[in-house]
Amino acid sequence: MPISLPKVRGIYRYSVLMSKITWLNVGGQADILFKPRDIEDLIYLIKNTKLPISVIGATSNMIVRDSGIRGITVKLGKEFAYIKYKSNNSIIAGGAALLSNLAYFAGEQQVSGLEFLVGIPGTIGGGIEMNAGAYGSDVASVVQSIKAVNLSDGNLYEFSSKEMGYVYRGHSLKGQWIFIEAEFKGVSSGHEVILHRLKEIINKKNKSQPVRGKTAGCIFKNPRAYQAWKLIDGSGCRGLNNGGAKISKKHCNFLLNYNNATASDLENLGNKVRNTVKDKFNIELEWEIRVLGSH
């Protein structure tokens, strides 16, 4: 019996192979991929379906399992990729805008404080969800307000940064959300000064991370008072492989699809590293990469 879906203005795609979309080039089929036309379209879908809903962004920090994703997978499209200057060093960005584009836009507006975002792959929505950060700064320190739709009731909410209850690489909101828009605040600075800082960050990233490989950013969060890469290295896991998956030799908190890996290859290798670190140091590493889909 065919599935009955709400009549939306956006686009439904069916049986979408996620390995064609994700940065790691792994993942089975998503039953239904939905790109809403606007916020009202998204809300209408959520309020009028009983199917499970998942959310993806740029998929730059994600493993989609080989079994794929059941139900509806929502991905915000170009309609949500806007970035615009407001006033007084404030910038509004849609949930699908890239963090790196926000950093460059801020530079053009002579707004400093957002430079760290240039080295973080992913979207505004994903960055808000995980409190993305680098080089001593994070989203929580520069975001002012956030608009989000709740995946349970389909209602639109607005939160201040304080109300988000931000913690290291996460927030304290209950339930599941899709982040639609955010306002960011920086400070005035010269364009050339900001441009120099952007170049510094990119150069540092290129030297220290496997930017040309199929990767999904840092595998694990840094435990309190420790650096994950040092624990991984100290456990002898640098360069470790499993099937087509490998721990990067350049930066060992990065997981690589170097030879047609499956999602299972990658996830199993990550768990092997976790177990090895636990045995060696009695410290439990927590995934920073999001794993989506059923076993």
From Swiss-Prot:
Its main location: cytoplasm. Its cofactor is FAD. GO terms for biological process: cell division; cell wall organization; peptidoglycan biosynthetic process; regulation of cell shape. Keywords: Cell cycle, Cell division, Cell shape, Cell wall biogenesis/degradation, Cytoplasm, FAD, Flavoprotein, NADP, Oxidoreductase, Peptidoglycan synthesis. Coiled coil: none annotated. Its EC number is 1.3.1.98. Transmembrane segments: none annotated. One of its GO terms (molecular function) is FAD binding. SUPFAM superfamilies: FAD-binding/transporter-associated domain-like, Uridine diphospho-N-Acetylenolpyruvylglucosamine reductase, MurB, C-terminal domain. It catalyses: UDP-N-acetyl-alpha-D-muramate + NADP(+) = UDP-N-acetyl-3-O-(1-carboxyvinyl)-alpha-D-glucosamine + NADPH + H(+). Pathway: Cell wall biogenesis; peptidoglycan biosynthesis. It comes from the Bacteria. Residues 26-189 form the FAD-binding PCMH-type domain. It is an enzyme of class 1 (oxidoreductase). Signal peptide: none annotated. It is found in: Cytoplasm. The active site is at 169, 218 (proton donor), 288. GO terms for cellular component: cytosol. Belongs to the MurB family. PANTHER family: UDP-N-ACETYLENOLPYRUVOYLGLUCOSAMINE REDUCTASE (PTHR21071:SF4). Cell wall formation. This is UDP-N-acetylenolpyruvoylglucosamine reductase.
